Curated annotation (Swiss-Prot):
Pfam families: Ripply (PF14998). A motif (WRPW motif) lies at residues 34-37. The keyword Chloroplast does not apply. Induction: By MESP2, and acts in a negative feedback loop with MESP2, functioning negatively toward MESP2 to regulate NOTCH signaling in the anterior presomitic mesoderm. Residues 74-109 are annotated as: Ripply homology domain. Signal peptide: none annotated. This is Protein ripply2. It comes from Mus musculus (Mouse). Belongs to the ripply family.
Length: 128
C-alpha cells in the first residue's frame, strides 16, 4: 500500500484498507490448521522411531485387542461392490463400522460377479 492509498483510507472510513496479496498458503496463521493428510515432522519421527517395532509387535495393520486395525494411510477408501450396497446399508453396516474408522469413504464399484448375473447363468445352464 503506498502513502496516497494509506492517506485516503485514513480519511475515508467507508473504504476498507487494501488486503495483502500473498497466496493463501503463505498467509500468517495458516500453518496452525491441522490437516490429517499432511504429516508433521513429529509424526514422521513417531512412526520411524525405535519404539515403532514395540508398538506393532505383530506387524503393521494387525488387529489389536479392540479388533480395530492399528495404522491407516489417510484418506481411507473402502471398496464395496454395487451389488451389495443394500447389504452395507442394512445388514453389514455395524460390522463394517466396527472394523474401520468412521473417516473412511465407501467407494462402490461395478462387480462382474453380481448375484443377478450368476442366477442368469445358472438359469441358462439348466435350460440347455
Amino acid at each position: 500500500m503506498d502513502t496516497t492509498e494509506s492517506a485516503e483510507s485514513a480519511h475515508n472510513p467507508a473504504r476498507p484498507p487494501s488486503r495483502s496479496r500473498c497466496p493463501p498458503s503463505a498467509q500468517p496463521g495458516s500453518e496452525g490448521f491441522w490437516r490429517p493428510w499432511v504429516r508433521t515432522p513429529g509424526e514422521k519421527e513417531k512412526r520411524t522411531g525405535p519404539r515403532a517395532a514395540e508398538a506393532l509387535p505383530s506387524g503393521p495393520g494387525m488387529a489389536e485387542a479392540s479388533g480395530k486395525l492399528l495404522q491407516y494411510q489417510h484418506p481411507v477408501r473402502l471398496f464395496w461392490p454395487k451389488s451389495k450396497c443394500y447389504d452395507y446399508l442394512y445388514q453389514e453396516a455395524e460390522t463394517l463400522l466396527k472394523n474401520f474408522p468412521i473417516q473412511a469413504t465407501i467407494s462402490f464399484y461395478e462387480d462382474s460377479d453380481s448375484e443377478d448375473e450368476i442366477e442368469g447363468l445358472a438359469c441358462e445352464n439348466q435350460s440347455n
